Design a protein with these regions (language model features):
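Short, exposed beta-strand "edge-strand" segments with a Pro/Gly-rich flavor and a Y/T-containing core
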Residues: 1, 50-57
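Short aromatic-glycine-(Arg/Gly/Cys) micro-motifs in beta-strand/loop hairpins
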Residues: 24-51
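Intrinsically disordered, low-complexity segments enriched in small/polar residues
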Residues: 18, 29, 41-42, 63-65
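A short, charged, amphipathic alpha-helix used as a generic interaction element across diverse proteins
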Residues: 55-73
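Intrinsically disordered, low-complexity charged/polar segments
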Residues: 20, 73-80
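Negatively charged, low-complexity tracts enriched in Asp/Glu with abundant Ser/Thr
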Residues: 1-25
């Protein structure tokens, strides 16, 4: 899965865009996906801090991890 496919899957699942960022950065209380210098990052951003940072050398692995982790978290919270 590539980033554009990830975005489409999240739209199909009707996951609110307020809950995640596929552009990285440090939005408050968002699950984030970012590429920096060929390394893909997945993390939770809260109050300007990257929490639970995971790094990947593969976009595919990062996308799959992001999707699975975000969906599991949202199901656990009863959001979806």
């Amino acid at each position: 899965m590539q980033k554009n496919e990830l975005e489409q899957k999240l739209l199909q699942e009707e996951v609110s865009k307020d809950l995640y960022s596929l552009k990285g950065g440090l939005p408050n209380e968002s699950y984030c996906f970012n590429e920096q210098n060929g390394v893909w990052e997945v993390y939770y951003s809260e109050q300007g801090i990257k929490s639970n940072l995971k790094t990947f050398n593969s976009e595919t692995e990062a996308c799959e991890y992001f999707y699975t982790s975000l969906i599991e978290m949202l199901k656990g919270m009863g959001v979806i």
